[in-house]
A protein has these predicted regions:
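Glycan-recognition and catalytic cores of secretory/periplasmic carbohydrate-active enzymes
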Residues: 1-387
């Protein structure tokens, strides 16, 4: 299967000026966010400080490390290592870690810090996080339970997002030689692949399994419009997650899944290449966008370009460049904001979902992170992130 670039859409001519602008915004935010974390989403495009208990607290340090890679300024290294210390303390005391999102917390922050600086505290934090992630393992069904009390039938489920958490487990096997981390990551990924991808190549946000037998039960949404729609960010996690699963396993089924879920996402983009918050909506609908989803997909395309033949890799890089151009030209932060990417959506309430409404048409910290990652991938083709 192949995916063709969009007709008559420009690629990003030069990512460097946009990286410079993003790095300047990160630098300006350091006085507020060196010893505190950013909240998951902004209020009127300004982030509030928080205590670092959120599942999103790894994305701001991840931005700091990318600013360090781009600029070489030691002020970013200093700030990044302070966040590593905080994350090490958090995992040691088990504060806000009883869930599956250890990868989102510790991969862009601590595995990055370890790779860049050799900081042993960062390595220790990430390995402890991998151990914590395995405490969510459910042998009956073969998956990592996302949230809630273990073995409670009301919480006996996994979610599409977790594909992005799995690289932490593969990394832990690489670091320790213990195959259990990677083995369970692969089993979870295969369980997700078998159940979360629908026949039309859209995705279910969450999927329930039977606590007694491990049999698949049903897909439900938490943050999408309804149980049958495709939440834009969930579809984006599937795109990038499939690329990463293919990288780590070389299982050709993941290559097939990547093309299927990517085609679904791209075919439902509005004219400006930035989706509404659920892919059920398109041009003409009066709904908020989710710019973070396009940034995630651009990074997934650039990841998969490393693993396919040259002609197809060029197609994937071109599409990623077109998406990043759309983001940089129309959605990048301007004016009085400490975010990098405008018009993200964390969770929008509908009569049919179960989420708490937060961060609608705001900056979201993972949107900023993946926008920066996409720019850095384009500017430094030999650089690879830490997923």
């Amino acid at each position: 299967m192949t995916i063709k670039p969009f007709a008559n859409k420009p690629e990003l001519a030069s990512p460097t000026p946009h990286l410079d602008a993003a790095t300047a915004r990160i630098r300006a935010a350091l006085p507020r966010f060196t010893y505190q974390s950013q909240k998951h989403s902004s209020v009127n495009n300004i982030y509030e400080p928080c205590n670092g208990h959120s599942w999103t607290s790894g994305f701001w340090p991840g931005q700091i490390w990318m600013a360090y890679i781009h600029s070489g300024d030691p002020v970013f290294k200093y700030a990044g290592l302070i966040h590593s210390e905080s994350l090490l303390e958090r995992i040691k005391v088990k504060r806000g870690v009883d869930h599956h999102d250890m990868g989102f917390l510790y991969t862009p922050s601590c595995t990055a810090a370890w790779a860049i600086t050799g900081d042993e505290n960062s390595k220790q934090a990430a390995l402890l996080a991998a151990d914590q992630m395995l405490t969510r393992w459910q042998e009956v069904g073969g998956f990592i339970q996302a949230w809630g009390a273990m073995n409670d039938p009301k919480n006996y489920r996994f979610i599409i997002d977790c594909l992005m958490n799995l690289p932490l487990l593969y990394w832990a096997t690489e670091q320790t030689g213990n195959p259990e981390y990677a083995q369970k990551a692969t089993i979870h990924a295969n369980t997700c692949r078998a159940n979360s991808i629908r026949e039309d190549n859209s995705t279910s946000h969450t999927f329930f399994m039977c606590a007694e037998t491990g049999a698949p039960l049903r897909g439900e949404t938490c943050q999408g419009y309804n149980n049958d729609s495709s939440w834009a960010r969930g579809q984006a996690w599937a795109v990038y997650g499939a690329a990463l699963s293919y990288r780590y396993t070389k299982d050709p089924e993941w290559l097939d899944i990547f093309y299927r879920v990517t085609d679904y996402f791209l075919s439902r983009l509005p004219e400006d290449l930035v989706p509404f918050w659920d892919l059920i909506f398109t041009d003409g609908d009066d709904e908020p966008r989710d710019s973070s989803s396009s940034a995630i997909v651009a990074c997934g395309l650039l990841e998969m370009a490393d693993h396919v033949e040259a002609a197809e890799a060029e197609n994937l890089r071109t599409i990623a460049g077109q998406i990043m151009c759309a983001l940089a030209e129309k959605y990048a932060a301007t004016g009085d904001t400490d975010g990098l990417l405008l018009h993200g959506t964390y969770s929008k309430k509908t009569p049919y979902n179960t989420c708490t409404p937060e961060g609608v048409d705001e900056c979201v910290t993972w949107g900023d992170y993946f926008y920066m990652e996409g720019l850095l991938r384009l500017a430094k083709p030999d650089w690879r992130p830490y997923w």
